[in-house]
Amino acid sequence: MEIILANPRGFCAGVDRAIEIVDRAIEVFGAPIYVRHEVVHNRYVVDGLRERGAVFVEELSEVPENSTVIFSAHGVSKQIQEEARERGLQVFDATCPLVTKVHIEVHQHASEGREIVFIGHAGHPEVEGTMGQYDNPAGGIYLVESPEDVEMLQVKNPDNLAYVTQTTLSIDDTGAVVEALKMRFPKILGPRKDDICYATQNRQDAVKKLAAQCDTILVVGSPNSSNSNRLREIADKLGRKAFLIDNAAQLTRDMVAGAQRIGVTAGASAPEILVQQVIAQLKEWGGRTATETQGIEEKVVFSLPKELRRLNA
């Protein structure tokens, strides 16, 4: 049984930054530090930060007065930002800069009077935050997930539309929705550069390469991680047995029964330690020393909020 590792895999620059913001805030201000929503969608990471003194909440009403609060990597709505400001809470924003880029696109289109079609998954915190950035009462922002949604879509002005996308979607699926939008609304504007983030694209390209070499794919990631789910779906669509597992404890012999080549990758919010634990388990079951595929070397680094850098200098 051969083990092949995807490259790149695991943490992206936005996740690294978000986790470091929480770590630094705890170091500087001491526990408790409040975090609105899970800072990243990974159980291992969240549990580790909770042990250090992070308190995860879903509503700002759960945050006591005079507290420090961190917004998660997924971003928040304008309403949440304003509520924190009105209450005088000390806020550190761990929103991924690539999500912030989409927020800026939404602001620009709204200020220029356009309505927006947002390609994303209902209920995901990034979607809720981005849709909550639209503030033109004369227009609207509409969520679609599929070409079928586009067919049913009703907007106020079909000639004055733009679209943006959730950063963690499948590139292939997004492309089909964009094509449907352009067919239905020929004048629709899109972003100058694709909203799908570099790390999402790189990991999807890597899992496709992995699927070409392996008969079974294991994706390390939590079930609420959008980009991890997309990796599993891509491998599945390519005809491979594909499983999403949080950690080695969820790995079963049935998953790898009869496999000659097992590919292992990890979502952008999954730490490498979990990948190594999965590899160790596979080796116990007879797997050979893992080899890595060649892939893009990621050198992207996002800086911390200047206030936190200054406080921690």
Curated annotation (Swiss-Prot):
The keyword Cytoplasm does not apply. CDD domains: lytB_ispH. [4Fe-4S] cluster binds at residues 12, 96, 197. (2E)-4-hydroxy-3-methylbut-2-enyl diphosphate binds at residues 41, 74, 124, 167, 225-227, 269. The keyword Oxidoreductase applies. It holds the Pfam family LYTB. Catalyzes the conversion of 1-hydroxy-2-methyl-2-(E)-butenyl 4-diphosphate (HMBPP) into a mixture of isopentenyl diphosphate (IPP) and dimethylallyl diphosphate (DMAPP). Acts in the terminal step of the DOXP/MEP pathway for isoprenoid precursor biosynthesis. This is 4-hydroxy-3-methylbut-2-enyl diphosphate reductase. It comes from Methylococcus capsulatus (strain ATCC 33009 / NCIMB 11132 / Bath). The gene is ispH.
